[in-house]
């Protein structure tokens, strides 16, 4: 919750009092504990007879006086069963879509969370209630333990942690400017951990560049250096366990919310080391695109597609590892971390050098339940993906070195092996060995996919790959028309169109649910602030402006999006000029209901320009599939190069015909990230549309107010 401005100075003064004491005695376990529960004591929910502001004022006075009993009593009273009562009341609602709409409304109204509201739209409306013990079993299943048998063929015991001992290299340090910049850009709706602190309260801690902020930066640097009393490490690494229903029949998805201080320091460290991290994973051979790589998904999908285009008869094996992030061997982390990122070693040892505890409450079970976490990535950790990718990089480099003729790529745990069938299958079998021996994990053929465009099933089966069939249900599925790479369709245009149709159907269903939300303002907020942006990833990976394959799905999407402002206006239909105005961005006087027809070319061209700029250094052998868009002189020339080149030429031509400045942006800003390119293209196009709309209004009605 946002701390009221009138009491913010009081709140920070009390915090400053505590931090000053801790600064003078940094090894005091008691002061560290008090810091970790500061927000839980001061910001606990207020009673019905008291405002939040008055509650903070009263608690700060109690805190300064050392009156712990009433403070703790306040905190305990705040632990009500509100969410359970709310869920119970929704059981009386018969329409599942209305239940989802009401939950989305509440997420916006009470938490101001568009991401939470968006998730509520497609969440199970009335999932089967869990039984006592279900949550514990779900967390235990997701958290294997050191010493237990691993998932490898020999069932070897999981190795102990074995963190580095003794003095470590000099730790990373952060400046006041770096810390304040990071906290201001953080997601204030991100959940807090066990301590009661979140990014909202952390922003209040670091509200301005003053003595308190400078002391807090020193404290954050102590955490980054691992200079924390041993008794506090377990409190910092403990996580709040939450289980989310994933279907209507009782399936559970356990998640963990880590401590905000560790998450913040971790994100600071990764941001500061971003250039080194990117170079490590991409040089001398580009292997890992899941950490620190701008447009990593688009680059990887384009590389796989380009390789298959240039090597007819090649296949792509997308590998799936069972419980990948939660089951890798942590001993494979220490050596590459110290060798390549010495400044991160101390913080890495703090995060992963000992067993962490996941605490959660289970309905029908008294007290708190707990599960240890000492294998794989810590859930709720901002370093989870980085550490997994770092441990994976050794065996991945070995595989790429042994098969230099193949394309071996990964996006976190999503590993792809591309090449001639016999070689690709041989590499896959080798990857199974490496993954088992190095990370103590296992691959699941039945969840992996072999994409074999133009390669008969018999040819794939002849390589020795266990192919899924009635006789071998646990074998690997083989597809021929297309595959999904990180949410991007790779394959034929009909496959891409079908993939897009399914994705659009999901978004349209959510738009229908949005229209059931009671408040019109919340409908507008969620639709324009979240839902219309969900199409962006798809449009960056398909040539959505090509009408032949995508016209039907584009029309369906645009109808659904524009139905929201039509219903908000209480009209059965909107005029063409009204629809154009509604689809303009807010900065240009519109409502922000961006349509497929407005954004498809901008999204695809931004992705293409980024890929064409990156490929010559990353994939020289594939770069000819993605020549610079502005160098293509004609459609015939582009067609002779590749299908992506033709689509980029067409998209650029369509954009330039409406907004000529796009051509200069393509030449000037090719090195910029995809999002910045897309925003530049979209703004140029929207500005041109705005001018055309104003001209049309003035022409139709010279006395129109906008004619002034």
Regions found by a protein language model. Give the residues of each.
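Extended C-terminal regions of large enzymes
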Residues: 39-111, 117-124, 569, 573-708
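Conserved pre-catalytic core of RNA-dependent polymerases
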Residues: 162-382, 386, 390-394, 603
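Catalytic palm subdomain of template-directed nucleic-acid polymerases
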Residues: 323-341, 408-411, 415-438, 456
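Surface-exposed loop/turn segments and immediately adjacent short secondary-structure elements
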Residues: 1-233, 237-240, 313-315
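Inter-domain linker/hinge segments that demarcate the starts of reverse transcriptase
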Residues: 213-226, 271-273, 300-309, 424-440, ...
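Basic, alpha-helical interaction scaffolds
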Residues: 403, 469-546, 607-614, 618-621
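Catalytic palm active-site di-aspartate
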Residues: 193, 238-241, 253, 269, ...
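Short, conserved micro-motifs composed of acidic
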Residues: 424, 442-481
């Amino acid at each position: 919750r946002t701390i009221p401005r009138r009491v913010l100075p009081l709140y920070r003064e009390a915090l400053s009092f505590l931090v000053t004491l801790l600064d003078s005695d940094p090894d005091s376990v008691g002061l560290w504990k008090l810091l970790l529960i500061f927000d839980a004591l001061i910001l606990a929910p207020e009673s019905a007879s008291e405002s939040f502001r008055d509650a903070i004022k009263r608690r700060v006075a109690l805190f300064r006086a050392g009156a712990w009993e009433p403070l703790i009593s306040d905190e305990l009273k705040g632990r009500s069963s509100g969410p359970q009562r709310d869920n119970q009341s929704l059981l009386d609602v018969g329409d599942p879509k209305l239940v989802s709409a009401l939950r989305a409304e509440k997420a916006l109204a009470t938490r101001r969370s568009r991401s939470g509201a968006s998730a509520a739209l497609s969440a199970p409306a009335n999932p089967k209630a869990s039984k006592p013990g279900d949550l514990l079993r779900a967390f235990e299943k997701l958290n294997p333990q050191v010493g237990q048998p691993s998932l490898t063929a020999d069932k070897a015991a999981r190795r102990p942690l074995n963190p580095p001992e003794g003095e470590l290299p000099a730790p990373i340090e952060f400046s006041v400017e770096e810390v304040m910049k990071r906290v201001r850009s953080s997601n204030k709706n991100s959940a807090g951990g066990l301590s009661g602190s979140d990014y909202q309260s952390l922003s209040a801690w670091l509200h301005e560049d003053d003595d308190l902020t400078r002391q807090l930066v020193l404290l954050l640097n102590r955490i980054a250096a691992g200079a924390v009393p041993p008794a506090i490490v377990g409190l910092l690494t403990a996580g709040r366990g939450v289980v989310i229903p994933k279907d209507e029949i009782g399936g559970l998805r356990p998640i963990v919310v880590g401590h905000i201080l560790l998450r913040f320091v971790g994100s600071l460290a990764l941001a500061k080391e971003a250039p080194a991290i990117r170079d490590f994973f991409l040089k001398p051979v580009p292997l890992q695109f899941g950490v620190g790589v701008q447009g990593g998904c688009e680059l990887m999908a384009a590389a796989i597609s380009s390789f298959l285009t240039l090597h007819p008869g090649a296949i792509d094996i997308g590998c799936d590892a069972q419980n990948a992030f939660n089951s890798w061997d942590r001993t494979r982390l220490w050596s590459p971390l110290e060798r390549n990122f010495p400044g991160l070693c101390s913080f890495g040892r703090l995060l992963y050098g000992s067993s962490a505890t996941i605490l959660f409450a289970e309905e029908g079970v008294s007290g708190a339940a707990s599960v240890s976490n000492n294998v794989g990535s810590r859930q709720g950790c901002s370093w989870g993906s980085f550490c997994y990718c770092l441990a994976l990089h050794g065996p991945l480099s070995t595989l790429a070195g042994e098969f230099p003729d193949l394309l071996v790529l990964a996006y976190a745990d999503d590993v792809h092996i591309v090449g001639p069938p016999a070689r690709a299958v041989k590499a896959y079998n080798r990857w199974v060995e490496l993954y088992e021996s190095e990370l103590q994990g296992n691959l699941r053929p039945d969840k992996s996919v072999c994409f074999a465009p133009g390669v008969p099933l018999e040819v794939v089966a002849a390589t020795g790959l266990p192919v899924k069939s009635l006789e071998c249900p646990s074998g690997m599925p083989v597809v021929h028309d297309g595959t999904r790479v990180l949410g991007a369709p790779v394959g034929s245009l009909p496959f891409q169109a079908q993939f897009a149709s399914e994705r659009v159907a999901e978004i349209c269903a959510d738009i229908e649910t949005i229209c059931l939300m009671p408040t019109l303002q919340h409908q507008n907020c969620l639709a324009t602030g979240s839902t219309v942006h969900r199409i962006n990833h798809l449009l960056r990976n398909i040539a959505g402006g090509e009408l032949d394959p995508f016209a039907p799905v584009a029309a369906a999407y645009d109808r659904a999006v524009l139905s929201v402002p039509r219903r908000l206006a209480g009209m059965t239909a909107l005029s063409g000029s009204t629809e154009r105005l509604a689809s303009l961005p807010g900065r240009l006087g519109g409502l922000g209901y961006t349509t497929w027809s407005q954004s498809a070319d901008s999204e695809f061209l931004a992705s293409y320009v980024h890929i064409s700029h990156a490929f010559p250094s990353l994939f020289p052998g594939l770069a000819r599939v993605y020549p610079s868009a502005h160098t293509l002189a004609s459609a015939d020339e582009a067609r002779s190069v590749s299908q992506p080149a033709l689509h980029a030429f067409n998209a650029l031509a369509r954009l330039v015909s409406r907004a000529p400045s796009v051509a200069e942006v393509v030449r000037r800003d090719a090195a910029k990230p995809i999002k910045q390119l897309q925003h530049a293209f979209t703004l140029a196009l929207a500005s041109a549309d705005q001018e055309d709309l104003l001209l049309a209004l003035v022409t139709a009605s010279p006395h129109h107010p906008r004619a002034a």
